[in-house]
Amino acid sequence: MKNQLLDAKVASEEQETVLRPSLLNDFIGQNQMKSNLTIFITSSIERDESLDHTLLHGPPGLGKTSIAQIIAKEKNVNLKSTAGPILSKAADLAAILTNLQKNDVLFIDEIHRLNIHVEEILYSAMEDFSLDIMIGEGPSARSVKIYLPKFTLIGATTRLGLISKPLCDRFGIHLKLNFYSCEELTQIVERGAKVLNVALDTNAAIEIANRSRGTPRIALRLLKRVRDFGIYQNINPLNQQITDYALNQLGIDKLGLDSSDHKYLRFIAENYDGGPVGIDTIAAALSEQRDTIEEMIEPYLIQIGFVQRTQRGRVITANALKHLH
């Protein structure tokens, strides 16, 4: 199982509230996306209209939820949040939509996991800002059209390919979030340290950033765990030595890989001479769900050039073999 410290899907309540940036100017990284979004938001405010429906996609932990909250804050409108798996019935979505006010933001996380019947309700809501509701049953049932105030739907997904084309095409704005650079993560760690009232030197911040898999959520989680080691050993401010020790104790190597990553790489290296090998074979051998491997393990390994996805299966690179040895 993936080390929860490196699981970008796991977020603490503290991170959700205290450590999130509240405005675009506070948001570190994703500069091209941020620049475009500033233009879109400013234009919508000048026109006194809702922002076009927006689809945010990219690996977990990169700031999709934060962006949704920032959009609502910048627009000075209400934000309603839910998630694809929660909306099991069309009535669930209809109840949310009918309570929206003009220009409000509805954020649906994991939108690729929407029930197809719920998704179909969204089509007219997104295009025409209306709902067709069936009242009654049997021969006496009739359809009633309910008109909605203009709103902005923000969908977030880690699996863009799983979103149906009809739904995808209804988003006027598509924004991709990429992994962060070490420099950007260092700034995020330093900002997080100030918010948490943690003293640390630059080398400690860089060490945490280097091991954070390009992901702010992981960087902030590691910062808090290093803080714990510093308190236990009475080290203040946090320095590179205690940071290195803490992260080693947590099973996180210099590149941010944990035992699950090493197990994945070694399986391919030792059993298939570096690959190719099919994803289902890997999942069975590691006793992991295919989705877990594709969402939590592979993206970063591909990003750092350790794994290649080919038509014949997964292949690990010479750099990966060098790192293992």
UniProtKB/Swiss-Prot annotation:
Its EC number is 3.6.4.-. InterPro entries: AAA+_ATPase, AAA_lid_4, DNA_helicase_Holl-junc_RuvB, P-loop_NTPase, RuvB-like_N, RuvB_C, WH-like_DNA-bd_sf, WH_DNA-bd_sf. Keywords: ATP-binding, Cytoplasm, DNA damage, DNA recombination, DNA repair, DNA-binding, Hydrolase, Nucleotide-binding. Its main location: cytoplasm. Residues 181-251 are annotated as: Small ATPAse domain (RuvB-S). It is an enzyme of class 3 (hydrolase). One of its GO terms (molecular function) is four-way junction helicase activity. The keyword Nucleotide-binding applies. Residues 1-180 are annotated as: Large ATPase domain (RuvB-L). Residues 254-325 are annotated as: Head domain (RuvB-H). It catalyses: ATP + H2O = ADP + phosphate + H(+). Mg(2+) binds at residue 65. ATP binds at residues 19-20, 61, 64-66, 127-129, 170, 180, 217. DNA binds at residues 290, 309, 314. The keyword Hydrolase applies. It holds the Pfam family AAA_lid_4. GO terms for cellular component: cytoplasm; Holliday junction resolvase complex. Has 3 domains, the large (RuvB-L) and small ATPase (RuvB-S) domains and the C-terminal head (RuvB-H) domain. The head domain binds DNA, while the ATPase domains jointly bind ATP, ADP or are empty depending on the state of the subunit in the translocation cycle. During a single DNA translocation step the structure of each domain remains the same, but their relative positions change. Homohexamer. Forms an RuvA(8)-RuvB(12)-Holliday junction (HJ) complex. HJ DNA is sandwiched between 2 RuvA tetramers; dsDNA enters through RuvA and exits via RuvB. An RuvB hexamer assembles on each DNA strand where it exits the tetramer. Each RuvB hexamer is contacted by two RuvA subunits (via domain III) on 2 adjacent RuvB subunits; this complex drives branch migration. In the full resolvosome a probable DNA-RuvA(4)-RuvB(12)-RuvC(2) complex forms which resolves the HJ. Belongs to the RuvB family. The RuvA-RuvB-RuvC complex processes Holliday junction (HJ) DNA during genetic recombination and DNA repair, while the RuvA-RuvB complex plays an important role in the rescue of blocked DNA replication forks via replication fork reversal (RFR). RuvA specifically binds to HJ cruciform DNA, conferring on it an open structure. The RuvB hexamer acts as an ATP-dependent pump, pulling dsDNA into and through the RuvAB complex. RuvB forms 2 homohexamers on either side of HJ DNA bound by 1 or 2 RuvA tetramers; 4 subunits per hexamer contact DNA at a time. HAMAP family: DNA_HJ_migration_RuvB. This is Holliday junction branch migration complex subunit RuvB. It comes from Orientia tsutsugamushi (strain Boryong) (Rickettsia tsutsugamushi). The gene is ruvB.
